[in-house]
């Protein structure tokens, strides 16, 4: 169909051997791009704990995948700081470590305001990150679902957007706000 696809691969609940076997199966199937992520803590755990024989971090996973020479590797990036990061500078430096380990580009967590992405892009450039940073987009199917996901990811919900969705939901027009928000960002 002419679409580029990227398989997701995480460090969660797998040994290094199992993870690299999955990557090898992807390569054999013709997959050339991987989104390499640490992954979220398994349900019921407050924090991520690596498998005893697994990759301890996304940096380790990226380095191992890069060593195979078989993939373009994309990694996650957080314009509003990963919830586990000490601060935004440390988070940008962690992204730099992933790029230096062999990632070819980054895809951001979603955000609601373009300035959030632009500030992040500039902070990355200031740290010497030159790899492409692709803005992440979240199609809003349910405003309640989007707010829950934003809370999990540390994504700030602008008050004016929240008010627009809350008002529209009461009036049965939630979909029209999604479209209007999209159109507003297309013209910025």
Feature annotation, model-predicted:
Residues 23-34, 40-45, 50, 59-72, ...:
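Alpha/beta enzyme core
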Residues 180-187:
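Conserved small/polar residues in nucleotide/adenosyl-binding loops
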Residues 16-18, 44-61, 112-124:
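Active-site-adjacent beta->alpha loops and helix N-cap segments on the catalytic face
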Residues 13-25:
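Glycine-rich anion/phosphate-binding loops
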Residues 5-9, 36, 73-76, 106-108, ...:
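Hydrophobic faces of well-ordered beta-strands that scaffold small-molecule active sites
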Residues 7-16, 76-89, 169-179:
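Active-site mouth loops of central-metabolism enzymes
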Residues 52-78, 127-179:
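Active-site pocket-lining/capping segments in soluble small-molecule metabolic enzymes
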């Amino acid at each position: 169909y002419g679409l580029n696809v990227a398989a997701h691969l995480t460090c969660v609940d797998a040994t290094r051997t199992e993870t690299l076997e999955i990557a090898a199966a992807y390569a054999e199937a013709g997959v050339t791009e991987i989104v390499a992520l640490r992954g979220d803590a398994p349900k019921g755990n407050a924090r991520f704990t690596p498998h005893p024989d697994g990759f301890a971090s996304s940096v380790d996973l990226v380095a191992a995948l890069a060593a195979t020479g078989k993939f373009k590797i994309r990694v996650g990036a957080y314009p509003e700081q990963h919830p586990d990061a000490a601060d935004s500078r440390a988070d940008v430096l962690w992204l730099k470590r992933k790029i230096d380990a062999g990632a070819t580009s980054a895809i951001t967590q979603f955000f609601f305001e373009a300035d959030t992405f632009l500030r992040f892009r500039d902070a990355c450039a200031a740290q010497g990150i030159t790899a492409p940073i692709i803005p992440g987009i979240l199609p809003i199917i349910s405003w309640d679902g989007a707010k829950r996901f934003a809370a999990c990811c540390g994504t700030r919900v602008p008050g004016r957007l929240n008010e627009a969705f809350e008002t529209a939901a009461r009036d049965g027009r939630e979909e029209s706000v999604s479209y209007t928000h999209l159109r507003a960002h297309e013209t910025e």
